Amino acid sequence: MANREKSILIGNGFNINFGGKAYTNDYIIKRIVFNARANRYEALFSGEISGDEIANIFTRLATWANDISAGKYDAIIPDTERPILEDFKARYNWELSHYYEVGLEDWFFILHVYFLQNADIADNWSSAKQGFERMMLDAIYNDGDIQSLYKDMGKPVKRWLLGFSKVFTLNYDNNVEDLIKRPVFHLHGDFRTLANSEDPHTLWGYMRHQKGDNLEIPAGLEHCFCNALFDYAGEYKYKIAYAFEQGERGLKALEKSGIPLQYFPAPIEDLIRAHREHPDLV
């Protein structure tokens, strides 16, 4: 009988096992607020918002979780997002007492509802979401400590992982590949790979570069601009990422997918045109 390939999927519990509470949800969220109050994120926002203001946004928005669960904003949720709303309510069927009880990706849904309720500032949605993403990535990165967890994993863990022909991970860190010295499949992106929006060798990055939208990445915060997939609507982010990998065929399918236009990095026709002109870009 031929040897069957064995695969493994690694999640955040793997990091918690070796890094402890520092990588649990509540500690990550607490770290964002601590870092904000220490003015760590001034460079991310070009000094347009203070650390105390960022901290207050988190504590105020957390109260929206209870209101969303209570049905206060049901009327403004689009029909296409009803399943997301019901899933949120099912998971938060109790009253939150602290801001750090809100799950990482659930912050994006709360923020989304906030902008639905305040439609007059809807143009700020993308930049606000991007700011949240980058702060969360920084808090997970934990001054780079997360990238050193492999040093504490030891030979038994290395031998165990080498017993799998393919290793998949939901985590952004690069500990497993540093430990086993083999490629690892990052399903949600990783800290060492630049985001498509910032990489001029990708379709999205090329279009931004052509428009002069390139962003200067602050020194020491490079990890905040990686290709991590971070969103409350998981189905959307995977469909969009997959479509980019499939080129024009994928982009055309994306146009008929029913995904709200706000999730696209640019109008579909612009993406298709850029791909035709530069088929080497993905």
Task: Give the positions of each predicted feature.
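SIR2/sirtuin NAD+-dependent deacylase catalytic core
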Residues: A2-V282
